[in-house]
């Protein structure tokens, strides 16, 4: 439901996340268009994270660790295959993200089905769940600060020349590289 709402509210989301784009109609329209293409990826990545967690709990780490490679392969292939058919490489990459998310979801769902059948259950509020919830919110705040820094950086960069948001993104990727390599 939220994805549907955000899909149609994308112009307002772009105004909040990249207010500097409002001064450049072409950049704003492209951001809205790409946002509408990519936003459904959030459904896939949420399910991917859920299924990767189920795998990890059961001691199966390979599928969750390999899932980002599926997205990277999808992005590379989309550049080569889709760019000639579409108007820009940005369009190809936007669709590549969506396709990659779908393949990540399928891959992890199949990995989970090998040993577990997902089902919806009503949680019992026992000691373990209370402890989890007590530890969850400080962890959420801690990880949220990093994401908030990225959002603030994006807002500021939207007022700078074209390419500044990409530089912020690349800097974040470099910042995460040691964690990705050494875990």
Locate the predicted segments by residue.
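Membrane-embedded alpha-helical bundles of multi-pass transporters/translocases
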Residues: 1-183
């Amino acid at each position: 439901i939220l994805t549907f709402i955000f899909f149609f509210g994308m112009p307002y989301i772009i105004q909040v996340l990249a207010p500097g784009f409002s001064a450049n109609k072409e950049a704003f329209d492209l951001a809205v268009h790409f946002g509408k293409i990519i936003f459904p990826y959030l459904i896939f990545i949420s399910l991917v994270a859920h299924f990767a967690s189920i795998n990890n709990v059961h001691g199966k780490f390979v599928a969750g660790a390999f899932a980002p490679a599926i997205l990277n392969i999808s992005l590379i292939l989309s550049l080569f295959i889709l760019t000639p058919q579409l108007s820009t490489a940005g369009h190809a990459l936007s669709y590549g993200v969506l396709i990659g998310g779908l393949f990540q979801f399928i891959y992890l769902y199949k990995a989970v089905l090998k040993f577990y059948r997902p089902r919806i259950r009503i949680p019992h509020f026992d000691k373990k769940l209370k402890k989890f919830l007590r530890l969850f919110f400080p962890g959420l705040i801690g990880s949220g600060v990093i994401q908030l820094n990225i959002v603030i950086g994006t807002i500021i960069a939207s007022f700078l020349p074209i390419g500044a948001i990409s530089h912020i993104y690349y800097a974040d990727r470099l910042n995460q590289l040691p964690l990705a390599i050494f875990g």
